[in-house]
Amino acid sequence: MTNRLETKYENLSSIFRLKGHDYQKQFFHLYAHRLAEMTRLLTPLAQKKWGNKEPIKKLCELRGEQDVHCILIGTIFKHQAHKPSILRDISEENQLAPQPPRQNYSDPEDKIVLEDELQRVRLQGKLNGQLLATGVVCAALGGTDSDGFFNVEDILFYESGPQKPLAPIKRSRLLVLASGLDQLQAHKFVEALNLFQYWLAGSLGNNKEAGSMVRLIVAGNSVRASAMAHVPTLQVARTQANANDTVQAVSQLDQWFASWARSLPVDIMPGPYDPANFMLPQQPFHKCMFPQAAQLATFQAVTNPYSCRLDEALVVGTSGQNVSDLLRSTSLDSALEALRCTLTWGHVAPTAPDTLACYPYIESDPFILRECPHVYYAGNCESFATELHEGSEGKRTRLVCVPSFSKTQSVAVVDLDTLDCRMVNFSVDAE
């Protein structure tokens, strides 16, 4: 039996647990709270960067004025001609030309607008609109012109909140990050899953390394990792077969989770294709789905996004929806770059609720990064990628794009003391 290191654990995801289910509210409240809180956080940062001589003005104060040099704080909105529209759904009915489907709807002609509680102004100047997203709150330094534009000279983002320092290194504590188990297709890589299980238990490779593993987080798409094929209504038999396959996949997952949880604590997040609520934040799986694993104190189903503290290290992550949505609406090159941007912007899911579905909160925006994480990850990425991001005031964050296990047979391992990160591959074909 492998002796395991123990860590102090704290679940910080209560802000993502829904206390009600009122979906009739408007999203205005969410945007309003986001802007109000981010304005409060950005104001001292803007004054520190640009000095107190630059006034911070509301957009309504610029009405009719020219050559006003100031700081504006507001929410970015992108006018995108290729953004998905309800018109596509009704085009056939009204005999309109349908919009062509696009994997990415960013375009050099996108128009960037900054809006606050009352007004909006078109931005131009020193900003790359293709790398910005609707919903991002920023401070912009610049001036107005005779055409009604605000010419941006510099731009400032929140860069997430303060960061608590890590204690001096004692001994490596390893956090294992996995995603995309796709149990419906597990017959294609069951050997890799077995090797993964042996590795977690300390029966494969370095037993000392296994003893250093303090937690496993599975970041979504455990049941399936792709959209279910469309089934015509009349094909009831096929629909029932799909349901039976899902039940069997969940049962098999229960056995895997129970086995892993006997070796170390396991946290399971729902993903975009799992049998869970679609909107962010996704709520934890019900324990009845995994009756064997649920009997173990080391197993728990958690939210997506998920936040926890392991000793001093703050760990925050998602099952990847925030990153994939950003890649559709911007010209960002990679999942790692998109993940880095959300950290810089200080917001886990800035495109929610515009193009990323989320609950219509009316009292707060839970997706704001009020404290800078030490480990920040996104699940279900096409491949493994990582970077140690160094922010202002000495903040250091390990960014991790967790690879889909079904596609790569790989997981990510983060040392919580050094913030080093590496990939471990369990493919039987791996060298």
UniProtKB/Swiss-Prot annotation:
Asked if Nucleus is a keyword of the record, the answer is: yes
Molecular function terms from GO: DNA binding
For the keyword Nucleus, the answer is: yes
Q: Where is the signal peptide?
A: none
List GO BP terms, alphabetically.
Answer: DNA strand elongation involved in DNA replication; mitotic DNA-templated DNA replication
Principal cellular location given in the protein's record: nucleus
InterPro entries in the record: DNA_pol_a/d/e_bsu, DNA_pol_D_N, DNA_pol_delta/II_ssu, PolD2_C
Q: Which GO terms describe its cellular component?
A: delta DNA polymerase complex; nucleoplasm; nucleus; zeta DNA polymerase complex
Q: Where in the cell is it found?
A: Nucleus; Nucleus, Nucleoplasm
Tissue specificity, per the record, is: Expressed in ovaries and embryos (at the protein level).
Question: Which controlled-vocabulary keywords does the entry list?
Answer: DNA replication, Nucleus
Q: Phenotype when inactivated?
A: RNAi-mediated knockdown in postembryonic cells reduces the protein levels of the delta complex member PolD3.
Q: Which domain of life is it from?
A: Eukaryota
Q: How does it assemble?
A: Component of both the DNA polymerase delta and DNA polymerase zeta complexes. The DNA polymerase delta complex consisting of three subunits: the catalytic subunit PolD1 and two accessory subunits PolD2/Pol31 and PolD3/Pol32. Within the delta complex, interacts with both PolD1 and PolD3, and is able to interact with PolD1 in the absence of PolD3. Component of the DNA polymerase zeta complex consisting of four subunits: the catalytic subunit PolZ1 and three accessory subunits PolZ2/Rev7, PolD2/Pol31 and PolD3/Pol32.
Instruction: Give the protein's biological function.
Output: Accessory component of both the DNA polymerase delta complex and possibly the DNA polymerase zeta complex. As a component of the delta complex, participates in high fidelity genome replication, including lagging strand synthesis, DNA recombination and repair. Appears to promote the function of the DNA pol-delta complex accessory subunit PolD3 in both embryonic and postembryonic somatic cells.
Q: What protein name is recorded for this chain?
A: DNA polymerase delta subunit 2
Q: Could you tell me which species this protein originates from?
A: Drosophila melanogaster
